[in-house]
Amino acid sequence: MKGFAPISLVILVIFLFSVGVWSSEEADEGVAPMEKTEQETLYSAIQGFVGKWWNGSDLYPDPCGWTPIQGVSCDLYDGVWYVTSMNIGPILDNSLNCSPSAKFRPQLFDLKHLKSLSIFNCFLSPHKHPVPIPSENWWNLAGSLESLEFRSNPGLTGQIPTTFGSLRKLQSLVLVENGLSGGLPTNIGELVRLKRLILAGNWFTGQIPDGFGGLNQLLILDLSRNSLSGPLPITIGSLTSLLKLDLSSNQLEGQLPLGFGNLKMLTLLDLRSNNFSGGLTKSLEEMHSLEVLVLSKNPIGGDIKTLEWQNMEKLVILDLSGLGLIGEIPDSISNLKKLRFLGLSDNKLTGNLLPKIATLPCLSALYLHGNNLTGELKFSESFYHKMGSRFGAWNNPNLCYVSGMVPAGHVPFGVRPCQQGEEEVTLVEKPNSKTQLGDEILNQNSHYTTSLGISSFGIDGFWWLSGFLQLLMFLLLT
């Protein structure tokens, strides 16, 4: 046994030496240096946003070590700390908040390892203190920047600088609810690594550039709530990786492109509140992954039976309201077993309403008002209990309900009871004021969310749908 003592001693020495080396490496990483130039550059860039009172060297003498700055992240390069992420704005209680005189300082563009830049709720006054996005120096970040996000900055004005086209590593460009205007730069189409392009809620004008069709890795394209006009570019059919396409609330026009049929991965298409016309395109049938289709408030026209709706079996939300559609509601819609919301209001639809539509297992909101539907509502008592106020059929003069099939308290708003042997009938619960009717319409809008179990608290205008669609896309992508 004594012969094993030297061997044990050697093993112990090796073990202790290994632990010492490991501990030394950990310690070295913990006290890794930061270049003084990088440190001063960081302080100056932040000071431009939060104000001259902010003294970074006193408050955060070791910003990548034992005195970290909220919203700033660092990584090691060759044993030295460099800033890789900066988030400015009131995200958390101790976040860096902007001053009323916030501005971009040129030192921001000297952070040569910066991968992510986010500025939220910083530039707030478009009249007293408008701030344009700097037009120069973005090429200094061309080798590092992967994510650029400006949100809720109404005082951030002017155009998107063409120098954004130099950011060839960019994967996410998000410019939402700012005061930006002008046309969309064509060279954004050269950012071929982009996966998210979200430019919603600004004042952009002009047409969508053809060059956007070159973004073949794009997953989300959201240009909603701007003033874009003209037809959709044919090249949009080249975005075959797209999961979400939201072009709602613009002034886009023309026919729905045949290229839509190439978007096999698309789960959400929102084109509401534009000027599209020319009928429903058959290419919509080829979008087999589609779960949300919102075309409402467009003068599209044509026959609702143009499409074989059973081919879109994954649909959860279908809103065709306000399109000027004609014809009878097709039986094929009754094959959409996952459908939760169906909006067919304010069209020119005719014919009897098939009872089968009420048997859709997931349906929790059905709006048919403002058409020329006829005959009896032959829905079961359980249907009315299930729907409550989420069923709308008013303003169909020749439509009536069978009294014995409707439970007390669930009489369909604005629909007359079917009566035999009487020439005069009156509408039940006819709205006695514009306010009452307006409340019902508002109630319909809120059911995009409530019919799916999502609270409508805080909904304002079209924000209710945008918020829901964003939440739904988040769930789909994760």
Where are these predicted regions, by residue range?
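Surface-exposed cap/linker segments adjacent to membranes
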Residues: K2-S73, T84-I91, N121
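LRR flanking "cap" motifs
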Residues: G48-A102, H127-V131, G302-W309, E313, ...
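LRR N-terminal entry segment and analogous cap-like coil->beta motifs
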Residues: D78-G158
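The feature encodes a structural signal of leucine-rich repeats
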Residues: F104-F109, K128-W139, T157-T162, S181-T186, ...
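Leucine-rich repeat
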Residues: D110-L114, W139-L145, N153, G165-L170, ...
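Consensus "Asn ladder" position of solenoid repeat domains
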Residues: C122, N153-P154, N178, L199-N202, ...
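Tandem repeat domain/solenoid detector
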Residues: K169-Q171, G179-T186, E190-K195, A200-L219, ...
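Membrane-proximal ectodomain caps of single-pass cell-surface receptors
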Residues: L263-T267, E285-V292, S296, G301-D303, ...
